[in-house]
């Protein structure tokens, strides 16, 4: 370079970009899951990062775990890359946690031990317990205050905007599949030395208004619900603010009213088990009362090491046969059948006693959602069908008969 010529700093795409303006149409349009990426300057990479614009499971798994899942191994076909699967519960459950509090405890310990500088988690609005507020928690108390799932679309990745200049060099991100797919895609561009990812399994999120419709059509006192979950006993468990619990059988849902309440992003998602996370903490592969954990790589084991001494650990188990129930469910859901409550209760009791349990229940839930979502995609976005459904989901879906139209 000739003497006297100024050295020009080369900026990266996200340094030149700005978050989308409020009220803008998001690139994924109706399929947008509001993950928050476009609410940060990392919107610069949205075409390569958005789970609903570009499916990149194999590349993501290989980058995060060193390999993609083995499609000939049934456990990996369903649950993703893994080093270890187990069930567990905290020996001393966290008061007010959704289950026993394993995810919250890991976040707290990651800060207490100095493993990370901050935890990306989701608090709640002071005005509404179901309105999510993503945050970079710096203290265990902030992580604890964020306990309990928020079953609405949450823009977690908008907090990426806060990273530059924050002093955060090591981050634990807690999130669901669509958020983690985008996060993994932009990971090389983040101002971080280390990123740990604790994933939550996720299906059937809703907008805040959709949640209200669901609660009002399902539960006796919508205004007092603190949290809820679709559980392994084929019932939805609601906890109310007075500490009482209420359960409603899956089969008693008002399907005609609720069929369109779930977000289009969730109806076109095939990342139920959070393929890009280092460690996954949920319940779908465990028996009732326990949580299901999948360690995908050494970082995932490092996260589990933080808390394992505090856990009651047991092997995963599996029993029953899901396939007939899945096939019948495809047809019932497609016809939007609503059963009388007495019949729904009876079917629920029979299925709870004789139906799939443990990993087989997890496969039941995956099969049911993947077949439903394939149908929804075929009917609503046929142009995306071939490229959008990953190979593992195609293999699972091919085991069932879907309506032809």
Segments (PLM) and residue ranges:
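Iron-sulfur cluster-binding cysteine motifs and their immediate structural context
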Residues: 2-68, 279
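Glycine-rich phosphate-binding "P-loop"
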Residues: 131-158
């Amino acid at each position: 370079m000739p003497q006297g010529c100024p050295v020009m700093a080369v900026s990266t795409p996200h340094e030149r970009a700005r978050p989308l303006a409020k009220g803008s149409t998001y690139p994924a349009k109706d399929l947008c899951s509001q993950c928050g990426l476009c609410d940060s300057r990392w919107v610069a990479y949205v075409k390569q990062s958005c789970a609903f614009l570009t499916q990149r499971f194999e590349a993501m798994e290989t980058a995060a775990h060193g390999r993609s899942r083995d499609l000939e191994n049934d456990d990996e076909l369903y649950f993703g890359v893994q080093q270890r699967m187990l069930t567990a519960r905290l020996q001393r459950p966290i008061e007010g946690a959704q289950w026993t509090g394993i995810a919250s405890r890991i976040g707290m310990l990651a800060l207490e031990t100095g493993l990370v500088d901050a935890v990306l988690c989701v608090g709640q609005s002071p005005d509404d317990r179901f309105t999510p507020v993503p945050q970079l928690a710096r203290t265990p108390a902030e992580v604890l205050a964020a306990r309990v799932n928020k079953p609405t679309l949450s823009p977690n990745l908008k907090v990426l905007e806060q990273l530059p200049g924050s002093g955060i060099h090591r981050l634990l991100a807690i999130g669901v599949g669509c958020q983690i797919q985008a996060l993994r895609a932009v990971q090389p561009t983040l101002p971080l030395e280390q990123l740990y990812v604790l994933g939550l399994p996720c299906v059937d999120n809703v907008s805040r208004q959709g949640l209200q419709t669901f609660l009002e059509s399902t539960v006796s006192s919508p205004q007092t619900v603190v949290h809820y979950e679709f559980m392994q006993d084929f019932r939805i468990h609601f906890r109310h603010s007075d500490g009482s619990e209420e359960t409603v059988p899956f089969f008693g849902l008002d399907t005609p009213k609720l069929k369109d309440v779930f977000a289009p992003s969730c109806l076109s998602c095939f990342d139920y088990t959070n393929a890009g996370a280092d460690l996954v903490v949920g319940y779908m592969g465990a028996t009732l009362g326990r949580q299901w954990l999948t360690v995908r790589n050494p970082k995932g084991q490092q996260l589990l090491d933080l808390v394992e001494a505090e856990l009651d650990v047991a092997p995963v188990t599996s029993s029953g046969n899901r396939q007939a129930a899945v096939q019948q469910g495809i047809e019932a859901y497609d016809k939007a059948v609503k059963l009388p409550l007495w019949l729904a209760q009876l079917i629920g009791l029979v299925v709870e006693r004789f139906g799939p349990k443990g990993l087989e229940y997890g496969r039941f839930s995956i099969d049911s959602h993947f077949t439903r979502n394939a149908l929804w995609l075929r009917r609503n976005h046929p142009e995306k069908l071939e490229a959008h459904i990953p190979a593992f989901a195609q293999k699972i879906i091919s085991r069932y008969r879907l309506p032809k139209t």
